[in-house]
Design a protein with these regions (language model features):
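Hydrophobic alpha-helical segments that form the core
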Residues: 16-19, 48-49, 140
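N-terminal leader segment of winged-helix/HTH proteins
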Residues: 1-38
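Alpha-helical linker/hinge and terminal dimerization helices associated
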Residues: 24, 28-32, 66, 109-128, ...
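C-terminal regulatory/oligomerization modules of transcriptional regulators
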Residues: 1-9, 131-163
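N-terminal helix-turn-helix DNA-binding core of bacterial DNA-binding proteins
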Residues: 29-71, 83
Length: 163
């Protein structure tokens, strides 16, 4: 019988967890896009996050909150505007910035999706106890810090000519 090698097991688990982030995102998008009728999963997320602000957020704020580029958010917002779900208006603070304001039609979509949202959360977390959800929430916060460390690591590698 081989001796137990914790280091190998931990490294393997890190690799699985890392790739799992991508797999989980892909699965979530594929499932939701298959069943959402009027908008994509990403468009819905942009609307829900924009609606959470007291005042319409600008594209850069949404990009930062959603972890993607401003250009990506603009592309999603333009398609939502064409469908009548949002209005893109110049920021009062900076006329060069565009703010995403949810229209009445968009608010209707968000309101109608609240039941869906409950079912999504209920399904995804069905096998979790409240304690496990609290722990997962805590660990997700640590993972978010890890993304910051990863960004710094890549930046330093690039500055040092390692990339």
């Amino acid at each position: 019988m081989k001796p137990y090698k914790k280091e190998i097991d931990i490294l393997w688990k890190k690799k699985l967890l890392f790739s799992g982030v991508f797999v989980q995102e892909n699965l979530l998008h594929a499932i939701m896009d298959r069943y959402l009728k009027e908008i994509t999963c990403k468009q819905w997320l942009v609307m829900v996050v924009a609606d959470a602000y007291d005042a319409p957020p600008d594209l850069s704020t949404l990009a930062k909150m959603l972890g993607c580029t401003r250009q990506n958010i603009k592309k999603l917002a333009v398609s939502l505007e064409k469908a009548g779900y949002v209005a893109l208006n110049p920021s009062e603070k900076d006329g060069r910035s565009l703010c995403v304001e949810i229209t009445d039609r968009g608010k209707e979509i968000i309101e109608n999706s609240k039941n869906l949202e409950k079912k999504v959360h209920g399904s995804l977390f069905r096998d979790f106890t409240d304690r496990e959800i609290e722990e997962y929430f805590r660990l997700s916060g640590k993972m978010m810090k890890g993304f910051g460390y990863l960004e710094n690591c890549f930046r330093e590698m690039k500055e040092n000519g390692e990339m």
